[in-house]
């Protein structure tokens, strides 16, 4: 009987990507198969996030539930990974001594040996070090699960915003070699992936080493990914205004595979608050980037992150944020009340705002953006939209569910053989959280670009033979 693995994931898309790699790694090394039932699992892994308030307590509550399982089944291995593990590794060992393995985002590739060590020595094992990009060298080949896939192209962040723990939990910015990124995407394309989402804490700061010693910029990488046959839609997240340079904006002019939707966090519309956050841009500079983007791609829609109730935020500061929201006309946002993260400078800033005021401001902000998002959705009524079919509709299994470039879910009638393909649909109805459409044309009637096959791309990337000799085919 195969061994069972359960992974519980909290947090960002990078954590989701890391969890998928943990599953691939443990399957390849030890034959573990995923389960959703904790009682079945031989290994229980918690991949944590420290961005939101009470992240640590949430971890210990979950571990308390798993301890009950371990009491009944002592052989179960419990592991804690992710950003809370990096931040609170010693505290986890003290407060939850029954945890067998503690690992950070950069050491997940060592999971098989850490689990084996904890079992053989009957003692907890912890590795929360930062061995740069080493983890990608030890991961098995990617396995596609559907028509979309995440691909991590860099790790860490070097910006040190005063409210953010990422530099302390994931380390400084480190980019994966260009060849490695392209090889992984080409492998996914061969397995039927049509859309890739390039991931990084500061993804547009990518500077990937090339085989000839040169450096590949993010703009160059986008064009190379777009050239792979089968990859017809590219997203990326999360980007930073400081490095959203003109060469990246130029890619929107000539690369149709790059979607007309961008998540570009601004956090606040107040220059005073941005300075306190150590965000190296002003509201005007942010709007300048958006103007250039809309010149290059007139139909592009923008989303952002916002922090409400940052220490010292006045009513004027908040109104500056509301003005920016209206000026830019954001389509959606991830918005939160400020939550002090231990170890960050902003955690020590004095704050005299009441919780009621913070909640009122968050509500006002979210209502404004929701209204703007609904207006965008209504403008789509009667238009044709190219969508990627993801699977059956969640509400009606006799229908299909697809996604537009601007992240709207569209439900429509169609046959199952369309799953994983692009179709053009006419939008016939608009709802709060989805759209309805009808098929206009299928992929066989489209003129999708084909530049280089996945096999050709893999042949062009740097590989090592059995003796460890690196080769490159130009």
Swiss-Prot record:
Residue numbers binding [4Fe-4S] cluster 1: 12, 49, 83
Cofactor: [4Fe-4S] cluster
Keyword S-adenosyl-L-methionine: yes
Chief location category: cytoplasm
Ranges for domain MTTase N-terminal: 3-120
The TRAM domain, residue ranges: 378-441
Reactions mediated catalytically: N(6)-dimethylallyladenosine(37) in tRNA + (sulfur carrier)-SH + AH2 + 2 S-adenosyl-L-methionine = 2-methylsulfanyl-N(6)-dimethylallyladenosine(37) in tRNA + (sulfur carrier)-H + 5'-deoxyadenosine + L-methionine + A + S-adenosyl-L-homocysteine + 2 H(+)
One GO location term (cellular component): cytosol
Residues engaged in binding [4Fe-4S] cluster 2: 157, 161, 164
Keywords assigned: 4Fe-4S, Cytoplasm, Iron, Iron-sulfur, Metal-binding, S-adenosyl-L-methionine, Transferase, tRNA processing
SMART domains linked: Elp3
Cofactor descriptive note: Binds 2 [4Fe-4S] clusters. One cluster is coordinated with 3 cysteines and an exchangeable S-adenosyl-L-methionine.
Residues annotated as domain Radical SAM core: 143-375
Pfam families: Radical_SAM (PF04055), TRAM (PF01938), UPF0004 (PF00919)
EC code(s) of this entry: 2.8.4.3
A GO molecular-function descriptor: N6-isopentenyladenosine methylthiotransferase activity
Subcellular location: Cytoplasm
Listed HAMAP family: tRNA_metthiotr_MiaB (MF_01864)
Family: Belongs to the methylthiotransferase family. MiaB subfamily.
Quaternary structure, from the entry: Monomer.
Function text: Catalyzes the methylthiolation of N6-(dimethylallyl)adenosine (i(6)A), leading to the formation of 2-methylthio-N6-(dimethylallyl)adenosine (ms(2)i(6)A) at position 37 in tRNAs that read codons beginning with uridine.
Protein name: tRNA-2-methylthio-N(6)-dimethylallyladenosine synthase
Organism encoding this protein: Vibrio vulnificus (strain YJ016)
